[in-house]
Amino acid sequence: MKIRENIEIFERIKLNKVAKFSDESRGRERLEEPDEIRTCFMVDRDRIIHSKSFRRLKRKTQVFIRTYGDHYRTRLVHTLEVSQVARTIGVALSLNEYLIEAIALGHDLGHAAFAHIGEDILNDFLPGGFKHNEQSVRVAKKIEKNGLGLNLTKEVLDGILNHSGFSNVSKVAGTFEGQVVRFADKIAYVNHDIDDSIRAGILKEEDLPKNIIEILGASGSERIDTLVKDCVFNTIDNIDKGEPRVSLSNEIGDAFIQLRKFLFDNIYLGKYLEDERKKAEFVLSKVIEYYYKNWGEMPELYKNICEEEGIHRGVTDYVAGMTDDYCTNEFNKIYIPKFVMY
């Protein structure tokens, strides 16, 4: 008997009945022979970790653009924190930890440079709009491995696609594991963005709404602990009542929504970042404008996409994959005069 088969048997013994068992995966777009020692979701996790798109997350902004402090979150650090929170919830619920890990690690593969500013600019440029969750799926299916894609399982792709959205009535993933990642993403970014905002000096602990802090906790670790435990216990109640969904309780969920709104009003869309947002918008817009007119200068993969799916699509895929630094360097290379020695 192969090691993988032993793991799959152990899943049957260990995991909750609502978990997604590895040997019941709906498979991949391209048929593959099963691995001898890894389940299909372990294979997906490893492919994501070793992908170029995953490595580039270390140079993509989470909130604060071009921060030079060593402790601000990048998109990669955010991804790792989401994975940790999601796995904690998943293990407590006896779900498939490998599926959770793969979805969490892949959920932001398609995120543009300059945080959500980049997403907004590309959304205006691409006919039909741009959403980072959809782009993450496209990266996994089409862009990675020079156009071959990672050939991930359908469950992982579904979890990546449906990790966005906040309310309990939003479109959700088809697995409990995917639903867990959706909540873990919010739990992670709301709390670590508060931490980074305090570190940047644009927010103080006492600025946080007192009525929310009394419910969720005064520190980041307290809030994460409150939210994780509430998600676990409320989801267990849902399962016991025959309601197969991951959710927060009404009280905790409402407080969390208010805290998230506070961040949007005061940080994400606040005045402190306004000048940096305008600079990022200008840089990204000019890079898009240049490659739209000169798409033949892009790498071969993206030129092929332009020919097959249109210039807007090819330019979007190329620019969406850029890191903050790469995009800025492209802008400088295209528009900034070089010094000439006479």
Curated annotation (Swiss-Prot):
Keyword entries, A-Z: Hydrolase
Keyword field contains Hydrolase: yes
Short name of one Pfam family: HD
Hydrolase listed as a keyword: yes
GO MF annotation, one: triphosphoric monoester hydrolase activity
Domain HD: residue ranges: 75-190
Annotated HAMAP family: dGTPase_type2
UniProt cross-references to NCBIfam families, sorted A to Z: PRK01286.1-2, PRK01286.1-4
Family: Belongs to the dGTPase family. Type 2 subfamily.
Protein name (record): Deoxyguanosinetriphosphate triphosphohydrolase-like protein
Species of provenance: Clostridium perfringens (strain ATCC 13124 / DSM 756 / JCM 1290 / NCIMB 6125 / NCTC 8237 / Type A)
